[in-house]
Amino acid sequence: MSTYVAACNIEAGKAGIVFQNSEQATMTAKNNTIKVTIGGSSTGIKIIATNSNAGNYMIKGNVIEAANGNGITVNFAKSATIVDNMIKLSGNTTSGISLTGCDSSTVSCNTVSGRYPAVSYQNRGIYGSMNQKCYISCNTTDSLYKGVHFSSSNIATKFRGNEMKKHYIGLYLDNTAVIDTQTHAGNRWTGTYNSTYGAWNENDSSIFNSSKTILIYC
């Protein structure tokens, strides 16, 4: 049986929509307006997949405001599609979109914005950890502590055509991060960065330019 949640107006303390299934059906969240308000573990839309993963999740065209927690979290899913969502991090939040342990999933054409530097919350627009063969493209992040943060292994991840505006750091790779080789990726750094670094790699800071830059390769 498929599940389709669309055009709903949801205000919740902990979670707006949660998909947790046995991978036997398609689950779609589309064109919803969601606000979550309470606690660091709050999530606008949350996907929790199981081991026998058939790739059946679509999160598209949602407008999410997170006063706490995360906008969208996707854990251990295969071929999940997260596209055309608009996420505002209005409070002491963690991430706009968090992708962890996923395989062959797409995060594309999303916009994540916050309130940095007016407030000093150390949040992230997009966070990726322990993924493989994922495609992160054409997203825009603005007014967040970190635009995009990679941690741990993200083998064969493609990071292309993303725009990072005003942040403390636009793109951050911590000392465990691996995202594989990126060639002619077309990412853009179009804002100012209070750290003076548009991008920073804890493993090798020399490969990135500092201050306000527009880069073609990453």
Q: Where are the model-predicted features located?
A:
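Glycine-rich beta-solenoid repeat tracts in large extracellular/virion proteins
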Residues: 1, 15-22, 40-51, 70-76, ...
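Right-handed parallel beta-helix
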Residues: 2-12, 24-38, 54-67, 78-91, ...
